[in-house]
Amino acid sequence: MSELIDVKTILSGTELGPLADNERLKRESKYLRGTIVEDLQDRITGGFTKDNFQLIRFHGMYQQDDRDIRAERAKQKLEPLHNVMLRARMPGGIITPKQWLAIDKFAEEHTSYGSLRLTTRQTFQFHGVLKPNIKLMHQTLNSIGIDSIATAGDVNRNVLCTTNPVESELHQEAYEWAKKISEHLLPKTRAYAEIWLDGEKLETTDEEPILGSNYLPRKFKTTVVIPPQNDVDVHANDLNFIAIADNGKLVGFNVLVGGGLAMTHGDTATYPRKADDFGFVPLDKTLDVAAAVVTTQRDWGNRSNRKNAKTKYTLDRVGSDVFKGEVEKRAGVQFEKSRPYELTERGDRIGWVEGIDGKHHLALFIENGRLLDYPGKPLKTGVAEIAKVHQGDFRMTANQNLIVAGVPSEQKDHIEQIARAHGLIDDTHSEQRKNSMACVAFPTCPLAMAEAERFLPEFVTEIEGVLKKHNLPEEDNIIFRVTGCPNGCGRAMLAEIGLVGKAPGRYNFHLGGNRSGTRVPKMYKENITDRQILTEIDQLVGRWATERNENEGFGDFTIRAGIVDEVKVSKRDFHA
């Protein structure tokens, strides 16, 4: 069957089978309204109906419960302690001190956990918001210029942007494009304002010129990247704009399409995949290309099997060149050959850096992104105290850290003093710890199969011990990530060592990613315990320490030494 006939078959729907039930749900939702208002008025249950459980995602929320107490509540004949997690829409992760103080106050007064969670989507999450407080939450955010539209669901999610305050002018341009792309691809329905902000119900017909009345087949993620930093992990995303500068001025973007990390255990038709390079476009074509990629995926994506609905599978099904050609046609552009660039690092530069504008920026390492007042380490209070005096802004990073940006020289010492007094600067944190990351998982995530956030700190301590045992210096560390399920929020499928939760206390153990985030790791051992994993790491690090080439990273070593095969083409190699 030729590619052209294949595409026609796909478009006619004959290849893919009956539509998934989510398509019915979206079609009947009256542009994402559903019966959410009625559910909010139902105080008999703390949860939402089956359909609205899905629909609230388009409004930036997930229904969850506290899994630590689920069994005990069941014994008492009580329903699970339903609550919602909200993820804010913050393109590029920039938030003002005034906004920060407002979200800090809400988290303290109206969430079950009293914490703020910085996430790999370069924004913050509230966890444990009970139904009576949901509308208040949205109205509080709206009062400070924040919303949560389309941070979940089958839409374009929060747009990430490289956090690079040193290159202040270029960063500002890239950040502005991240905001423009976010606004351009945002749902146009008034449902959010009507439901949460008591907006006037207008007698108008909603239209979604880009997303369509059934929205996208699956979630869609976009980034704006300033090389050589790859802090946003381009290959975890559907659409990436790599900033190309000429004499310090942004002139256009290289466009990468079709990355993504989610998969399903036991389903070899699912796999993590790197994005394909489509080529360069000038700035004035950016929004046209963004819309063309989204609408092509909207029309060609798999709406029958949600496990194969993401852009990466569409590219592999129709062919990358065919997809690219359709984007060119819809955008009225011809991709030029990509301009040279290199991605070399992913970590945040923890500590102080000075920008070319003479202002100072303090990157704070926040382990797992969890801002909470721990005994002896009141991290959440510390950031609030900084916000009370800070004259610049805060920048949340895709590594779950926080940058205090735009600090004038005369305020630098005072900001550092506050940070140190509250444990936000800890000189004992190793480079290994700073290069380790986990998703939330238990107790709040309903998809978690194993611990991640609560597991990581102590396990990293054990990895630190292994590195020390083999006499490896501080700079020789390993990109280590844990995700509680195969959906990939912790981006373990771009790590040198990636653990993917399989069952309580058990993980699939992946090796072979690289430090720059441009290679997918391969499964080394399946469904093994953390003790078995540590034993394996000890043996592997021992070999790395004695057999490696000069400056050879751990992931590169595991491939050269034949410990795992390199994943070059995911569809062919990942499960081979």
From Swiss-Prot:
Which InterPro entries does its entry note?
CysI (IPR011786), NiRdtase/SiRdtase_haem-b_fer (IPR005117), Nit/Sulf_reduc_fer-like_dom_sf (IPR036136), NO2/SO3_Rdtase_4Fe4S_dom (IPR006067), NO2/SO3_Rdtase_4Fe4S_prot (IPR045169), NO2/SO3_Rdtase_4Fe4S_sf (IPR045854), NO2/SO3_Rdtase_FeS/sirohaem_BS (IPR006066)
Question: What does the record give as cofactor?
Answer: siroheme; [4Fe-4S] cluster
EC identifiers of the protein: 1.8.1.2
Query: Quick one: which residues bind [4Fe-4S] cluster?
Result: C439, C445, C485, C489
Keywords from UniProt, A to Z, are: 4Fe-4S, Amino-acid biosynthesis, Cysteine biosynthesis, Heme, Iron, Iron-sulfur, Metal-binding, NADP, Oxidoreductase
Which chemical reaction does it catalyze? hydrogen sulfide + 3 NADP(+) + 3 H2O = sulfite + 3 NADPH + 4 H(+)
Any one Gene Ontology cellular component term annotated for this protein: sulfite reductase complex (NADPH)
Cofactor note (record): Binds 1 siroheme per subunit.
- Which GO molecular function annotation, any one, does this entry have? sulfite reductase (ferredoxin) activity
Record-linked SUPFAM superfamilies: Nitrite and sulphite reductase 4Fe-4S domain-like, Nitrite/Sulfite reductase N-terminal domain-like
- GO terms under biological process: cysteine biosynthetic process; hydrogen sulfide biosynthetic process; sulfate assimilation
Query: Which pathway is recorded for this entry?
Result: Sulfur metabolism; hydrogen sulfide biosynthesis; hydrogen sulfide from sulfite (NADPH route): step 1/1
Pfam families the UniProt entry points to? NIR_SIR, NIR_SIR_ferr
- Family designation: Belongs to the nitrite and sulfite reductase 4Fe-4S domain family.
Kindly state the subunit structure of this protein. Answer: Alpha(8)-beta(8). The alpha component is a flavoprotein, the beta component is a hemoprotein.
Q: What is this protein called?
A: Sulfite reductase [NADPH] hemoprotein beta-component
Tell me what organism the protein belongs to: Aliivibrio fischeri (strain ATCC 700601 / ES114)
